[in-house]
């Protein structure tokens, strides 16, 4: 998933990764590889794997995986008066302002391999 400019989303299962049940909020959980640096101030870096609780709603301030048109991105979600703001957590990047988007889920964890 893009942590930068959104990119075309294609559902593709690369692998399965066992996770202890105490770390899983429910069965509707998936993982995504992060590409880009828009979420570095939130501790999400290029190459990380994020854990996402699948749901189609989000509260202001939650980090979400979202579809904008056919492009997927990870950003902080804000529902404002007449639009949605998908805010990067990188001071050098601008927010994405859209009339609507599809929430894929809320990020609740990060795996980092080094």
Locations of regions flagged by a protein language model:
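SH3/SH3-like beta-barrel fold
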Residues: 66, 86-88
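Glycine/charge-rich catalytic "coupling/switch" loops of P-loop NTPases
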Residues: 102-114
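Short, positionally conserved secondary-structure boundary motifs
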Residues: 1-41, 72, 79, 83, ...
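Flexible, small-/acidic-enriched active-site or ligand-binding loops
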Residues: 90-94
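Structural motif
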Residues: 47-48, 62
């Amino acid at each position: 998933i893009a942590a930068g400019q959104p990119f075309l989303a294609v559902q593709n299962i690369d692998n399965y990764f066992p996770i202890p049940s105490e770390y899983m909020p429910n069965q509707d959980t998936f993982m995504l590889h992060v590409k880009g640096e828009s979420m570095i101030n939130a501790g999400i870096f290029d190459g990380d794997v994020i854990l996402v609780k699948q749901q189609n709603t989000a509260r202001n301030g939650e980090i979400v995986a979202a579809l904008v048109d056919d492009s997927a991105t990870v950003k902080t979600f804000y529902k404002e008066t007449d639009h949605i703001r998908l805010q990067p957590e990188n001071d050098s990047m601008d927010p994405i302002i859209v009339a609507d988007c599809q929430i894929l889920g809320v990020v609740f964890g990060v795996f980092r391999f080094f």
